[in-house]
Amino acid sequence: MAALRSPVVMIHGAFCGGWAFDGWRALFKSKGYETYAPDLRHHAEDVEPPSELGQTSMLDFARDLEAFLDELGEEPILIGHSMGGLLAQMLAARRPVRALVLLAPSAPWGVLPATPFEYASAQALYLAGDFWNRRLWPTHWIAAANALDNVPDDERQSVLDRFVPESGLATFETMHWALDLKRATQIDPRDVVCPILCIAGARDRVNSPGTVRSVASRYRGRARYEEIAGHSHWLIGEPGWEKIAALSLAWLDDVLANESAAAGS
C-alpha cells in the first residue's frame, strides 16, 4: 500500500477547472489514492477573471503548479487532460515525478499537428486578431461540436455551463508554438524520465490520435500509447470514461509494482 500513497495531481485543460476531474477523483480515491485537482490561475467558477488572464502564460501556470507540488512535499503522479497534459509534461521535465498519464494531451513546442483540421483550427483562431493579449470566452457551439461531441446533449450542456474564459497567451503558446519566440512549451524529452501513458480517443479532432502518438514517440521507450475506439476528446467525462480511468489505474499498478520490485532487488 505504500506505493499507493503517492499523491495524484490531476491537471485540467482549457476553459475548465478542477471540477472536470470529479469522476476520476472519486474512482481513484476508492482505490486508495490521495487526489488533488487544483484550478489553474484565474479559472475559478462563477467569478469573472481579471483582464490579466489574457496575458497569463503556460509558464505562469507551470510555476503555480510547481508551487502546489512543493507544498505537497511528495513525488507525485500527474494526470493531465488536453492543455493540462502539456502542463504535466512541462512539470515532469522540471522535477521528479513518479508517473504521467496524458489524456488527449496538447503537444509541446516542435510537435507538428497531424491533421488538416488541427491546422485549420489554429489558422482560424489566428485570423481572429490579437487574441494572445486578451481573455478568450468559450464558444459553446465549437466546444459542443469538437471537444464534447461524444457527450449526450443533457450532460454536454451541464459541462458547457461550467466553462470559464481562457488565457489568450497560453492558447497562443499551445496552438501557435512556431510563432512563440519564447518557446514557452519547449520540453527536452530527455528531461522526462518517468513512465508515461498516452491515451488518445480514436475520434478526437482536437488533439488527434496522430498528434498524441507523436507526443508519445518523443519519449521513446518510456511511453506507452493507447488509442481508445469510439472515444473523442472529453476522455475525462464522456460515456465510457470509467474504462479509461480503469486502464490508467491498472497501468499505474504495474508501474508502481515494477518500481517496488526494482527497489527491493
Give a label for each model feature.
Residues 13-16, 82, 202-203:
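Active-site glycine-rich loops that stabilize anionic/oxyanionic intermediates
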Residues 29-49:
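Conserved alpha/beta-hydrolase
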Residues 79-84, 88:
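Gly/Ala-rich beta-loop-alpha elbow adjacent to hydrolase catalytic centers
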Residues 96-133, 170-178:
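Flexible "cap/lid" loop of the alpha/beta hydrolase fold
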Residues 117-162:
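Helix-rich cap/lid subdomain of alpha/beta-hydrolase
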Residues 192, 198-200, 204:
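Short beta-strand/loop motif that positions the catalytic acidic residue
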Residues 205-211:
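Conserved alpha/beta-hydrolase "acid-adjacent" motif
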Residues 222-265:
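Catalytic active-site module of serine/aspartate enzymes centered on a nucleophile-bearing elbow/loop
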